[in-house]
Amino acid sequence: MTLLDTDLDDVPAPQGQLTLKLLASRQDTNVYGDISGGWLVNQMDQAAELAAGREAGGRTATVAIEAMDFLSPVRVGSMVSVYTELQEVGHSSMKIDVEVWVRALHEQHPDERQKVTEARFVMVALDDNGRIRAVHD
């Protein structure tokens, strides 16, 4: 089962490895007071880069986001956890599923987690000169 084939009810727990954990703050909000989607994409990109870098043993870059779903808004004060799972390794590229889960620390049930965003990132391994190289060279 892949990220894009699942439904929220099918997989009620995070898939993959916890890669980033941070607090959503007021400076990251849009004009309506919710955390900006762009901020979430930035965190997901950083997590995908960390996961790809672990696999490739060095520098990587994002070449595509194949699919992304924003499932629910994120509120200020939420604890944001970004999970990554390596799905496929090609010659020079890697496909990484990224999920964002939140815990709303200020709500009545602060232990409840909710998936708010999911995406598949395509990353490539780079050499020291910024040229594409084999993932496992």
Predicted regions and their residues:
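N-terminal, well-ordered alpha-helical segments
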Residues: 42, 78-82
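Hot-dog-fold acyl-thioester-processing enzymes
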Residues: 2-64, 123-137
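HotDog/MaoC-like acyl-thioester-processing domains
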Residues: 3-10, 14-20, 75-79, 87-137
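Conserved interaction-surface patches within small, structured recognition/assembly domains
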Residues: 63-73, 81-86
